[in-house]
């Protein structure tokens, strides 16, 4: 987000829960702070599904609200719990010119509940927002790569990966320290049992997943220059919890092959083999 003016900004607040509601109220938005207050659905067992349904208000909310004349955006944190911890995450202004961009900030779930309650009692409530965030120049950062050469098909590459960076307010243990450790364990365990893979096993710890995936983009660019042949890639980026299975991005024929591997995982209670998205860096 951009910063607020030096003295902050104070404005009336308009609360919406969906983009449909935002468009319905577009003529009421000018000069106001838009408060996106759509909670994640607690009835969904898969928290990533609940997250996916709610994340667009944080990702695109400021861009759309700015086009309707809003002066700022407050977004309910994407969190199933009621607590006082605001959550950081990616947001975008799309192709809005710098002069049209408005400040955006997350509010904790408890804060969102309180603000919504206060607005129900006083529609003319004014909200004061002050923040001094800014974009600094890029600095050079690095992917970390290691590999075990394949003994039969060294030019066929299998990637196991995770991302090194995390949001600055957290310690990154789940996102994605656990994935980094899991990725590094793969070659360590194979070497421990003296297993030599037929294809090249490459461990890639990507930098800059959280705000642009530039580590993955750079890896892809370099790989194309070298004309490398990747036959398989997997990323662990879902926290350090008990493994449940795999979301697979492939065509139907390859997915059928991968699904046949499920019998090897059943003794470990790993049962989820479904077509879906791959890791963000993959």
Residue ranges of predicted features:
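Structural recognition of the beta-strand scaffold that forms the well-ordered cores
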Residues: 15, 33-37, 71-76, 104-106, ...
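Soluble metallo-hydrolase cores and metallopeptidase-like ectodomains found primarily
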Residues: 1-27, 93-173, 185-198, 221
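Sec-exported extracytoplasmic/periplasmic mature domains
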Residues: 66-71, 75-78, 116-120, 188-195, ...
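Metal-dependent peptidase/peptidase-like ectodomains
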Residues: 6, 11, 102-104, 112-113, ...
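Short, solvent-exposed loop/turn and secondary-structure capping segments
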Residues: 26, 45-49, 83-88, 157-158, ...
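Soluble non-cytosolic domains of exported or imported proteins
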Residues: 52-60, 106, 110, 136, ...
């Amino acid at each position: 987000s951009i910063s607020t003016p030096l003295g902050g900004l104070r404005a009336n607040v308009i609360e919406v829960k969906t983009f449909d509601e935002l468009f319905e109220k577009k003529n009421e938005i000018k000069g106001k702070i838009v408060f996106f207050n759509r909670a994640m659905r607690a009835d969904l067992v898969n928290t990533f599904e609940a997250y996916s349904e709610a994340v667009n208000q944080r990702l695109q909310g400021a861009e759309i609200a700015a086009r309707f004349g809003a002066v700022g955006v407050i977004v309910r944190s994407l969190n199933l719990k009621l607590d006082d911890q605001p959550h950081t995450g990616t947001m975008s202004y799309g192709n809005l010119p710098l002069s049209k961009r408005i400040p955006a900030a997350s509010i904790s779930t408890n804060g969102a509940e309180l603000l919504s309650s206060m607005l129900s009692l006083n529609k003319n409530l004014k909200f004061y927002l002050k923040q001094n965030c800014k974009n600094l120049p890029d600095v050079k950062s690095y992917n970390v790569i290691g590999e075990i050469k394949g003994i039969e098909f060294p030019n066929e590459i299998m990637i196991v990966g995770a991302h090194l960076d995390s949001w600055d307010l957290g310690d990154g243990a789940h996102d994605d320290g656990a994935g980094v450790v899991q990725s590094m364990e793969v070659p360590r365990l194979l070497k421990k049992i003296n297993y030599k893979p037929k294809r090249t096993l490459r461990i890639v710890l990507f930098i800059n997943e959280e705000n642009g995936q530039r580590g993955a983009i750079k890896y892809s660019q370099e790989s194309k220059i070298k004309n490398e042949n990747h036959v398989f890639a997997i990323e662990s980026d879902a926290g350090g919890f008990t493994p449940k299975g795999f979301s697979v991005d492939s065509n139907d024929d390859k997915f059928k092959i991968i699904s046949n591997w499920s019998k090897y995982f059943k003794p470990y209670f790993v049962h989820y083999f479904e077509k879906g998205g791959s890791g963000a860096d993959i």
